[in-house]
């Protein structure tokens, strides 16, 4: 048996048997991805169209991380007559990513540097009754990764719309089958908004 003051500060007895803990294996989890898509397309006479909706849900291997993505697409082509064609396509996507911080604010370095004799997962990550007082095997200038997963957030949310429309004119010039003259006018749009957020609760090492 040996005495660890960090265990005592976390509300445990403080005494522990020498054991080896798999802190890396305990922290990471199995990732999960789910994709769903619905599509409808048809061609009737001189008009063809296609519409689709897609959704992706993903859990990352780091707790509280993941991604959600929703998309929609539509396209229409219309042969007005032997000379004129017109059409458009439009796309929309919404992507939200919850990621783990890196560099000096990272939590993965804490996971990999945790001593094998310290039970990172089994030790409460804050003092009893004091959720803003982190418990960690080292100085709390770094976040306990479990405390971070329960309290902080690093996210990016991007909405994007892009597409184009066209009109095409093919005059009849009696040049035979080898030569054709085509006039095409096309305009497009691509716009997006992106919101990045870092949530650092009271007690976070970021504060």
Model regions and ranges:
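Transmembrane beta-strand segments of outer-membrane beta-barrel domains in Gram-negative
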Residues: 130-159, 186
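Small-side-chain secondary-structure face that scaffolds active or pore-lining regions
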Residues: 61-69, 77, 91-103, 159-160, ...
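Residues embedded in well-ordered regular secondary structure
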Residues: 1-63, 101-104, 148-155, 166-170
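Hydrophobic, lipid-facing positions within transmembrane beta-strands of outer-membrane proteins
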Residues: 34-38, 70-74, 161-165
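A surface-exposed, glycine/aromatic-enriched loop/edge motif typical of exported proteins
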Residues: 1-2, 93-135
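Transmembrane beta-strands of outer-membrane beta-barrel proteins
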Residues: 49-51, 86-88, 181-185
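Short loop/turn motifs that connect adjacent beta-strands in outer-membrane beta-barrel proteins
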Residues: 43-46, 83-85, 172-181
């Amino acid at each position: 048996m040996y005495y660890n003051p960090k265990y005592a500060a976390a509300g445990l007895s403080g005494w522990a048997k020498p054991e080896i803990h798999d802190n890396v294996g305990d922290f990471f989890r199995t990732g999960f991805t789910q994709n769903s898509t619905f599509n409808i397309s048809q061609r009737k006479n001189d008009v063809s169209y296609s519409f689709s909706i897609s959704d992706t849900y993903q859990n990352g291997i780091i707790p509280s991380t993941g991604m959600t993505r929703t998309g929609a697409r539509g396209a229409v082509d219309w042969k007005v007559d032997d000379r004129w064609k017109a059409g458009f396509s439009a796309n929309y996507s919404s992507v939200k990513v919850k990621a783990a911080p890196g560099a000096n604010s990272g939590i993965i370095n804490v996971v990999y540097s945790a001593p094998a004799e310290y039970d990172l997962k089994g030790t409460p990550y804050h003092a009893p009754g004091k959720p803003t007082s982190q418990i960690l095997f080292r100085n709390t200038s770094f976040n306990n990764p479990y405390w971070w997963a329960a309290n902080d957030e690093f996210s990016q949310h991007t909405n994007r719309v892009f597409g184009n429309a066209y009109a095409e004119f093919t005059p009849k010039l009696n040049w035979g089958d080898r030569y054709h003259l085509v006039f095409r006018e096309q305009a497009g749009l691509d716009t997006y908004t992106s919101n990045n957020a870092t949530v650092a609760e009271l007690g976070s090492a970021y504060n």
